Amino acid sequence: SDVYKRQVIRSAFDSAGQRCSALRVLCIQEEIYDDLVTMIRGNISTQALGDPNNFDIDIGPIINNKALENLNNYITKCKRKGMEVFQFEGKESNTHIYPTIININSISDIEDEQFGPILHILKYKSNEIDQLIAEINDSGYGLTMGIHTRIESRADYFGSMSNVGNI
């Protein structure tokens, strides 16, 4: 839905993704994967980079040059590993990174937490939910988790089995 898409974009890319609670991994059930990813990609291609004091700017600068270099190196490394990387290509910037989507096959594909406008997307099958929860629990990350579903029992199950700080 449109509301869900906006929540994903805001959670992943507000503050240029430099919040400890920013969305880092979006796990999408395969039945809705293609449509949702298409909507998210379409939205990030409209994000404006610049001074966040300006009302019409969506993505502010990366905190410093070292962080910017690390994020760019991470994106390059993911491309070299053969991961599908989607990044809207706009005007070059020495202080910003365009919102980036990296498709992953497993939570373990993420080596380190990236504090920037990078969203990892993982497609999963509904019958693999226990495996997905185990991967999340084994990842070492888990400050926050959001669960969006129309099936309340699935949300309850996912939440009760996940070792995270906040849901």
Can you annotate each of these PLM segments?
Residues 1-105, 127-130:
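ALDH superfamily catalytic-core signature
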Residues 80, 96-167:
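Conserved C-terminal structural/oligomerization subdomain of aldehyde/semialdehyde dehydrogenase
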